[in-house]
Amino acid sequence: MLELSNELAALRKELLRLRGDRTVYPDATIVIPVNTQKDLKNICQLLSDLAKYSDRKRIEIVLVINNYPANDPPKEIKMYQHMGLTVIDIPHVEHVGGIAIAARIPGIKVANSSKIILFDADCRIPDPTALINWYIQQFDDNYDLAYTHVNYTDLPPGISVKVRMFVHHASRWFRRQILGIPTSRGSNYAVRKKFILQLFAEGRIPYDIHVGPAVKSTGGKIAYSGAKELVVLTSGRFFAPGWKVLIEYLLWRTGYYRRILKAKPKKAVIEQ
């Protein structure tokens, strides 16, 4: 048996509590892709946040640990299995579009719940009880996709970074409120298992940013909340300050939306 530090042993106890009776299906499954090159240190913070969930719902957590040499798997695979998590280990994720959504799919396939909640490994969740309960309630209210506001943590100081954040949030508000385009993103959304697996199999969601428009095009119901207690924080540690960097970002972002969103999703029928 693996020996855990006192801190990890305490976390294991809470994660086992979170899952509850394994002979009973979970109320929801959280799937988190873990890139071994950058996420192994971050995932414990997110797991600690999730372990603070204090209600009675049974929550399954699936980690998809990926991007490592096939002959040298990280020791954390066995550690997280010992901590009560379901772990899918894939040395190399085959992908056509974004690697992030491709890495989520194996975890979604093995989920024991049809209610899938998706986070990135570097996220922080200030109020996991409110957020998880809200997501489960949206499923119970027959929504097919739900998402909440995402803000940033670990941002570098500087006016240029603040301007970048303003532009980022303003553009998302404009797309959501004025253009009616769902702005769910990979670091924080919930979707029905059948929806995302079928859309991915059809090649209609090569990136997470396609999920909202694709679900909408099928007639799926979509819920959004900007409530403060439901906010998820994602890391801005890779952002660099400076006006030159800001201009380059704006040019890149404009080109990104043109490349990724130029093709509107075709009408599709989701099997019931």
Residue ranges and their predicted role:
Residues 114-124:
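Short beta-strand-to-loop acidic/aromatic patch adjacent to the donor-nucleotide binding site
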Residues 130-145:
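Conserved donor-nucleotide/metal-binding helix-loop-beta segment in metal-dependent transferases, i.e.
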Residues 1-49:
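N-proximal low-complexity "stem/linker" segments adjacent to membrane-targeting elements
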Residues 205-213:
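Acidic donor-binding loop at a coil-to-helix junction in glycosyltransferase catalytic cores
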Residues 47-92:
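Acidic donor-binding segment of Leloir-type glycosyltransferases
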Residues 225-244:
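Active-site donor/metal-binding and catalytic loop motifs
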Residues 146-159:
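Short beta-strand-to-loop element that shapes/binds the nucleotide-sugar donor at the catalytic cleft/hinge
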Residues 93-111:
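Glycine-rich, basic loop-to-helix element that forms the pyrophosphate-binding segment
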